[in-house]
Amino acid sequence: MPTEPIRPLKDVWLRPRRVFRELATCPVGITDYLLAAAQGVGNFLALYRTEGPDTHRGVEEILGNSLAYGAVAGVASLFLMAAIYRRLGARAGGKSTTPQVIHVLAYGSVPLAASLAIWMLTALLAGEAAFVDTPRPDVEGFVVLLLHLQVISYVLLLVWSIVLQVMGFSEIQGMATRKAFGLWVLGQIIGFLVSLFLALIIEALFPGLLLHIIPQHRP
């Protein structure tokens, strides 16, 4: 009986292990980079939402900066995290290759890539209110409801992306899901520390550059 062909972008939602098995021998491709870029854009949009209402950024500026800087940051983060997880997996007795790790990080973020479409739709309907942590009192009830639904959907899709990545690491590393979750958490901690270190170096070499690029939280 012939095996049903795999459709990675669709099947990864509910059959991640099979998807990552099928991708195990595939080289890194344009889809991996596009998914990483989409994840970076989504993260930048989420950061802009933490800015205070007195920043006076327009929707066009927010979307433009997110598409430009977020896409680059997403792809750079893909390679950074792939190197980290590749080394952690090897130390834990895993058997993955770098392309396999990249596939897990990229295709495991498909739900987050889907959240980007929700961000865009919310921005079109709600305007600048979509990027304010606390809506103004004069914002219409429908817009407030839309913003709450957008936040809830983002959190749920983020959690599902984490689940997919953990299951992916379990599959490619040949380890139990619990151990794969510990590997994922440790990798995130190391990735944060490395990113912080790199940010300090960039700030020392190019003062003020990151303040211009990265959205800053303002209470």
Predicted regions and their residues:
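Membrane-helix interface segments in multi-pass membrane proteins
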Residues: N43-A73, W119-V155, S195-P219
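Membrane-helix interfacial "entry" motifs
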Residues: A24, V28, D54, G58-S66, ...
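A generic short alpha-helical patch detector that favors 3-5-residue windows
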Residues: P8-D11, A76, L80, L157
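N-terminal juxtamembrane cytosolic/stromal segments of multi-pass membrane proteins
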Residues: M1-H56
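Alpha-helical transmembrane segments with an aromatic anchor "belt"
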Residues: G58-A126, T134
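Interfacial aromatic "cap" segments that immediately flank transmembrane helices
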Residues: V28-L35, S96-I118, L147-Y154, W160-V194
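Transmembrane alpha-helical segments of multi-pass membrane transport proteins and ion-pumping complexes
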Residues: F44, Y48, L78, A82, ...
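Short helix-terminus and kink motifs of transmembrane alpha helices
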Residues: L14, L78-R86, A90, P99, ...
